[in-house]
Design a protein with these regions (language model features):
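Short His/Asp/Glu-rich catalytic/ion-coordination signatures at enzyme active sites or charged loops
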Residues: 72-87, 136-155, 179-220, 279-319, ...
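N-terminal helix-rich structural modules
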Residues: 44-257, 261, 693-695, 745
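Short pre-active-site segment immediately N-terminal to the catalytic Zn-binding motif
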Residues: 512-530
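Active-site-proximal, well-structured secondary-structure segments within enzyme catalytic domains
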Residues: 191, 195, 224-227, 234-279, ...
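Short, Lys/Arg-enriched N-terminal segments with co-localized hydrophobic residues
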Residues: 1-15
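C-terminal, non-catalytic "cap/extension" segments appended to globular domains
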Residues: 48-83, 87, 94, 275-277, ...
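Sec-dependent signal peptide recognition
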Residues: 17-24
Length: 745
């Protein structure tokens, strides 16, 4: 079977895959390489640092370790277990200064501008900075602390100034422009031509063409935005850490044993022994709202979660949102654009906000119509069983689960017994073998340092030739200081322009650890997310590009490959071989599989509406004049105009919408998940129609060749047409979600 499954009423958010700082590097064209730094004795420095005093010597050694070339096996690996925060600020400042010196050498080159001495030379800059950003990203996302957040706040404006200094270097841009407009470009390979185009656009669209006065204002805006966006993200994290609901044993009604065990462990970590903690994260909130029979507590947990950043205190984000929107609008106005979204989408697949809105609005009516049907089913059960008069937002998941059992005799918790985290990982390796010819071998000799004991590492090889491809790091479990959600990133990307570089990729999740000695069981939705993020890792590992910048992504395309990989979770090969009961070891019964298939489009009204509401509000925020905007009022009025069902809230309310306000990664681009899903649904049909189904070798080879290995070396629209022979069709998406498909006359 192959179906798009939805076994829980809300899908875990696919988090921002490149961490903010990696995206920052891409935008500055610093994903390349750089200054040679003196190689230090890493182990000696580490041993000295671990003695840890606050002396200047310790700071200098910490700085040297952060700047050091990576040593050890696999072309060198990060020393995650040895670096400390002590020297982060001076190391970052030194690396930025070195990078600016490299840029000045290129800008002041007396020779005529060429592809090699300008574009390729830029690709070679920033190696020290790249390494430091890898560590910075770990401290930001995987092991944040109050100490780091102070450093982050200090560095944000400095990083912004650094970026602006490069982007506003007139001599550098003149050289880039000269290459861009030269006859030389015409004889370059298509990939090299695209590198020139991406480099030119990254400057011309980011203030390089402005006069000196406007450049100064542009840089000042960026500096302030960096501060505001950092503050926004830290405020949300503060509310996630501060709000916890503690339960007594008598308040556990309806909760499966696995959830009770996780809640008990969370309470123990917070010195509330004998109680049960529901933390203010999606991974804790979601199952509680699905199963708890305590309606009052459901409301409390729901309010805590959807009020993050919106509590009228020091961590309230509404004023920050208003200022961010105003500054973004002013900044693109300097470039001549009517609004932020028009600027942002110009180089995306959608090309314009109007095209993105048209896609979303074509799906919206079917989504809210389905919500009406879902609510009617839920209310009937709620009245009959509990005497409720209306379904509230904190009831939706709870009664949706009851409807699922009533309509399909399908229990999400029963399915969960077959979803063991370790088995799912092996299933992903199986898919990688069949589609990519990859072989994953765990590195167990301690030769690859990790930043937490939960992290494990695998070497990736070509199964046929044995050629080394890279490493895959996995950090699966939730813990204090780790950002919520799930994401993928790279510590080093594939390139060949200075000798073949291997890939250091990672997947990061927030699964709740099982009880000691017991396997970790996860929901189907979380299993889809697991496969999704692994799809990003495969995209990194399959890269065949020559230059660092060609590893960058197009936002409304970059989720396509990862969304597509979710489909292999529900293939017969995976279900029959890897989805086995955690106690009996028996495979999932055919009767249960049949129920899953029948319920494939269940609750699509909820999942589509909560997502689209966020995407549409994001787009509306970035297409209006934000002067004097009240974000809370704007959100309410926008949803009212959309006729948003009152039983559903946006997946991300504005004060906690980190995708668009803690960085610019998804600003006016949250629609990109649906844009990519059109491609996903259409590509899935190519496999479904092939003789070998989802493991058809010919289709798989085309997938890897045209959609994974090329990264951003080929325009995404051209790449998809090379795979499919035509553009993707939205009708495939509508079929996937069980929505009516309009027949063409």
């Amino acid at each position: 079977i192959l179906v798009k499954l939805s076994l829980i009423t809300i899908k875990r958010e696919y988090s921002m895959k490149p961490q903010f700082i990696k995206a920052f590097l891409i935008s500055s064209i610093l994903m390349g390489c750089s200054t040679a730094t003196e190689t230090i004795n890493v182990q000696y420095a580490a041993n000295t640092i671990n003695k840890a005093t606050a002396s200047v010597k310790t700071l200098e050694e910490s700085k040297a370790l952060l700047l050091a070339k990576w040593q050890g096996p696999f072309q060198g690996v990060p020393v995650f277990d040895q670096v400390t925060l002590v020297g982060l600020v001076p190391a970052m400042e030194q690396a930025m200064a070195a990078n600016l010196a490299e840029i000045d050498l290129i800008a002041n080159n007396s020779q005529a501008p060429t592809f090699e001495n300008t574009i390729v030379a830029m690709e070679k800059t920033g190696r020290d900075l790249n390494r430091i950003f890898t560590y910075y990203g770990i401290w930001r996302a995987n092991k944040s602390s109050s100490e780091f957040r102070k450093i982050q706040t200090e560095l944000a404006p400095k990083l912004s100034t650094f970026s602006s200094t490069i982007k506003q270097n007139k001599k550098l841009f003149d050289r880039i422009s000269a290459v861009y407009n030269s006859d030389e470009v015409k004889v370059l390979s298509p990939a090299k031509q695209r590198l020139v185009l991406l480099t030119y656009n990254s400057f011309s669209r980011d203030g390089a063409t402005l006069n000196d006065s406007d450049k100064a204002r542009y840089a000042k805006i960026n500096q302030r935005l960096a501060q505001l966006q950092t503050k926004f993200g830290n405020n949300v994290l503060a509310d996630e850490e501060s709000y916890v609901v503690y339960l007594t044993k008598e308040q556990l009604g309806g909760l499966p044993e696995s959830i009770v065990n996780v809640a008990a462990a969370a309470a123990d970590e917070r010195d509330h022994q004998g109680e049960y903690a529901i933390t203010n994260t999606r991974s804790s909130m979601d199952p509680f709202l699905t199963y708890s029979t305590e309606r009052t507590l459901r409301k409390q947990v729901w309010q805590n979660y959807y009020s993050r950043g919106d509590n009228g205190d020091d961590f309230d984000n509404n004023a920050i949102i208003a200022e961010i929107l105003q500054l973004r609008h002013e900044r693109v106005g300097l470039l001549g654009y009517k609004n932020y979204a028009s600027w942002r989408l110009e180089d995306r697949m959608a090309k314009s906000p109007e095209n993105a809105i048209a896609l979303m609005e074509s799906v919206w009516p079917a989504a809210i119509a389905r919500v009406d049907e879902e609510v009617a089913d839920m209310l009937a059960i709620g009245k009959r069983q509990d005497g409720i008069e209306q379904v509230q937002a904190w009831d939706y998941r709870f009664y949706a689960e009851k409807v699922r059992k009533d309509k399909y005799d399908l229990d999400s918790d029963e399915v969960k017994q077959y979803l063991q985290l370790n088995n799912l990982r092996e299933a992903m390796f199986y898919v990688a073998d069949r589609l990519f010819n990859f072989n994953f071998i765990e590195v167990t000799d301690g030769s690859v340092p990790v930043f937490h004991e939960d992290v494990r590492v695998w070497e990736v090889k070509d199964k046929t030739s044995g050629e080394h491809i890279g490493l895959w790091y996995l950090d699966p479990f939730a813990r204090k200081g780790k950002r919520s959600g799930a994401w993928a990133t790279t510590y080093r990307s594939h390139t060949t322009f200075e000798g073949k570089k291997n890939v250091l990729s990672s997947n990061n999740s927030n699964f709740s650890k099982g009880v000691a000695g017991q396997p970790t069981l996860i929901s189907w939705s979380d299993a889809e997310t697991y496969f999704h993020e692994f799809g990003h890792a495969l995209h990194f590992l399959a890269s065949k590009v020559e230059y660092p910048t060609l590893n960058s992504g197009v936002r409304d395309y970059t989720e396509f490959q990862s969304q597509l990989l979710e489909r292999w979770l529900s293939t017969d090969e995976v279900i029959n071989n890897y989805l086995v009961h955690y106690q009996t070891g028996k495979p999932m019964p055919k009767a249960l599989i049949a129920k899953i298939k029948q319920a494939a489009t269940f609750n699509q009204g909820f999942s589509t509406t909560e997502y689209l509401a966020s995407a549409l509000v994001d787009m509306k925020f970035h297409t209006v004049d934000p002067t004097g905007i009240d974000p809370d009022k704007f959100e309410r009025e926008t949803l009212s105009a959309l006729k948003m069902p009152k039983q559903i809230v946006m997946r991300h309310r504005s004060p906690q919408f980190g995708h668009i306000f803690s960085s610019e990664g998804y600003a006016s681009s949250y629609y990109g998940y649906m844009w990519a899903e059109v491609l996903t649904s259409d590509a899935a049909e190519a496999f479904a129609q092939a003789p070998g189904g989802f493991y058809d070798k010919d289709v798989a080879d085309k997938l890897v060749e045209h959609l994974f290995s090329v990264r951003n070396a080929v325009d995404p629209s051209e790449a998809y047409r090379a795979f499919r022979g035509r553009d993707a069709k939205v009708e495939a998406l509508m079929r996937d979600r069980g929505f009516p498909v309009k027949t063409k006359k």
